[in-house]
A protein has these predicted regions:
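C-terminal segments that line or cap access tunnels to active or ligand-binding sites in enzymes
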Residues: 267-278, 321, 333-335, 340-508, ...
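N-terminal FAD cofactor-binding segment of flavoenzymes
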Residues: 43, 56-79, 161-177, 234, ...
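Active-site-proximal substrate-binding core of FAD-dependent oxidoreductases
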Residues: 546-589
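N-terminal Rossmann-like FAD-binding beta1-loop-alpha1 element of flavoenzymes
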Residues: 2-27
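Glycine-rich FAD pyrophosphate-binding loop
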Residues: 20-43
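Conserved beta-strand-loop-beta-strand element in the redox core of flavoprotein oxidoreductases
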Residues: 311-331
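B-type heme-binding environments
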Residues: 78-163
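Active-site/ligand-binding neighborhood in enzyme catalytic cores
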Residues: 185-193, 198-316
Length: 600
């Protein structure tokens, strides 16, 4: 069976990944000259790596974790290679080597100061994970402090498993730490929740988490008005400036109660709640190895091929038309998967006279205009926290950024010593330099506006002074190359879609009414309900399983995000209340508690 996939973003690549393993013939057509969609990075003409935006990987990204472990890589490391037999020879107190996740460590100098005493001697020439399991120290695995100490003693890699490294190993193992900066250094606001804040948030989020049938209603309610005036000032700033704001790339003005409560729920379920970033540019760490792996499995890629029309015949797709170098090519297949952003897809639907489906996509038509930028300094800015991500709370464009060099490993930046990769979360607001929105400025003016807003912040300015850095040290300024000037405004070649209180209920299913047309992407319905790389992978897996079901083939692995058993049980009880037109379970529980308290 032949499958044609339109779009080589995360979701399209996921479909190819899952189906090629099941024996399908896969062809991918992509309008750009490289894969990755919104996640891709690239290197400019000066070989400086650049990202669409800084990209965080949450602790509940289980579908991403699973698929990333299947993508082999060759990690470029400046370390020696050792065989397992060589490591086994170093097993004494005065010469002690060990292995951890295929890396080789010389712990000889650490033996005497090891807080666990002589247990470390048992690791000589062995796999540390096995020793920790044997002596009850499993918690050492991926513990941040343990890993930081261990990495000081790394001397090489294990030859036998060098090629078995995966994309998952390219994740920076350290936690991404956020810090809030205000324009006035003495205007620091406390970011914390008091017990009344916790009670209110428990009530607010509990209504969502402990619901099922009525949950969709909470995705239509804006979060921001529910917090204003209800939380303490420190609590309010903690939520809006961080969790429901630029800290995680959300627009607080369009975030719904349902999305935020879901985000909190899935985070709370995790034993370790850290967010991570890649240890090198995203395409080099993930996308490029993935494409190479898929090609090795037989997937055929056709870049610079843009879908222009869908030819429908009764209840099936007859063919697709794609454009390549001014030439129109007709494509035929058994099944078709459209994995492009909903805005471009809607344009195709209209051109193809598929108006019934287009009407549904019209309801998704809310563009998220976050703009990505890079600033390179020829002197190092010494940030006071490790592995930091920074939020300029008072900046008109709600700027968030992080220094790439603190997170990337062995990535040559040339003359650049500090490379800030950032995002304008709210570029539609008026800037403080030109008094215009970022979307109505020319590209060069926008760069100057960003620099101006950065240096308006006393915290950033003082940090630069301590590092002997000024605006004169900026040698590289860039707006992500998807953006260009048109009719006095900035527009992007690839529009970004995110779910919010307006469009959540209109997210489409992966299966269409046409028997051989499927769609995939993070705009489709997923169990995670949060626009993210995880939802893109999940959507790809859902689409893959629909096609596998069609041909009676075994399904691929798919992690369905869901509540823990006790929460699921209470949600089902709330369904009964909902059918009886009672209020939410949380409210009813509070009423019962108050009644019992008064009666008692």
């Amino acid at each position: 069976m032949k499958i044609i996939i339109i779009g080589a973003g995360i979701s399209g690549l996921t479909v190819a990944h899952e189906l090629v393993k099941k024996g399908f013939e896969i062809e991918i057509y992509e309008k750009d000259n490289e894969a990755g969609g919104m996640a891709k990075s690239f290197r400019n003409k000066n070989n400086i790596p650049t990202e669409h935006s800084w990209r965080g990987y949450g602790p509940f990204y289980y579908n991403f974790f699973e698929i990333s472990k299947q993508i082999p890589i060759n990690i470029r490391e400046n370390f020696n290679e050792y065989t397992l037999d060589e490591v086994k020879e170093h097993n004494t107190e005065n010469d002690l080597w060990c292995i951890y996740k295929n890396d080789v460590y010389d712990l000889t100098d650490f033996v005497k100061s090891h807080p666990g005493g002589s247990i470390i001697l048992q690791a000589g020439g062995k796999n540390l994970e096995d020793v920790w399991d044997e002596y009850g120290y499993e918690w050492h695995n991926d513990n941040e402090n343990v890993m930081n100490t261990l990495n000081k003693f790394k001397i090489g890699v294990l030859v036998e498993s060098y090629s078995s490294k995966s994309v998952y190993d390219n994740l920076n193992k350290n936690r991404l730490n956020f810090e809030f900066w205000y324009n006035k250094d003495n205007d620091k606001k406390s970011h914390s929740l008091d017990y009344l804040d916790f009670l209110y948030l428990f009530f607010l989020f509990g209504k969502v988490i402990l619901s099922d049938d009525r949950k969709i209603n909470y995705f239509k309610v804006r979060l921001y008005p529910l917090l204003k005036g209800k939380l303490s000032k420190p609590g309010y700033h903690y939520i809006t400036d961080y969790i429901a704001g630029p800290g995680y790339g959300f627009d607080k003005n369009t975030m719904s109660l349902g999305h935020f409560a879901t985000f909190i729920e899935y985070t709370l379920y995790q034993k370790e709640k850290k967010w991570q970033v890649m240890s090198m540019p995203t395409s080099e760490a993930w996308i490029d190895p993935w494409v190479k792996h898929l090609k090795n499995l037989g997937v055929k890629f056709y870049f610079n091929h843009e879908l222009i029309k869908i030819n429908k015949k009764k209840d099936k797709i007859d063919s697709l038309l794609v454009k390549h170098k001014n030439k129109v090519i007709k494509l035929n297949s058994d099944d078709y998967v459209i994995s492009i952003n909903p805005f471009n897809f809607n344009d195709i639907l209209k051109k193809s006279n598929m108006m019934e489906m287009s009407i549904m996509y019209n309801k998704l038509n809310i563009v998220n205009n976050q703009i990505s930028f890079r600033l390179g300094f020829n002197k190092k800015i010494n940030f006071e926290i490790k592995n930091g991500g920074f939020v300029l709370v008072d900046s008109p464009y709600n700027i968030t950024f992080y220094p790439q060099e603190d997170h990337w490993i062995n990535v040559d930046l040339g003359e650049i010593k500090t490379l800030l990769s950032g995002t304008l979360i709210l570029p539609y607001r008026k800037g403080s330099l030109y008094g215009k929105s970022g979307l109505s400025l020319k590209l060069d003016n926008l760069k100057e506006e960003i620099i101006h807003q950065l240096f308006e912040c006393d915290v950033f300015t003082n940090l630069c002074k301590k590092s002997d850095v000024s605006k004169k040290n900026i040698i590289f300024k860039e707006i992500y190359n998807d953006w260009y000037e048109k009719d006095g405004y900035l527009v992007t070649k690839n529009k970004k879609w995110v779910n919010n209180f307006i469009n959540e209920e209109y997210r489409p299913l992966q299966k269409t009414d046409l028997e051989n047309l499927f769609i995939s992407g993070s705009h489709c319905k997923t169990s995670i309900s949060i626009w993210s790389m995880e939802s893109a992978v999940e959507s790809g897996k859902i689409t893959s399983n629909l096609i596998l079901d069609k041909y009676n083939k075994e399904n691929c692995y798919y992690y369905k995000h869901q509540s823990i058993p006790i929460v699921k049980l209470l949600s089902k009880l709330d369904n009964i209340l909902y059918k009886l037109h009672f209020k939410n379970l949380v409210i009813e529980m509070i009423i019962i508690i108050i009644f019992l308290f008064i009666k008692g």
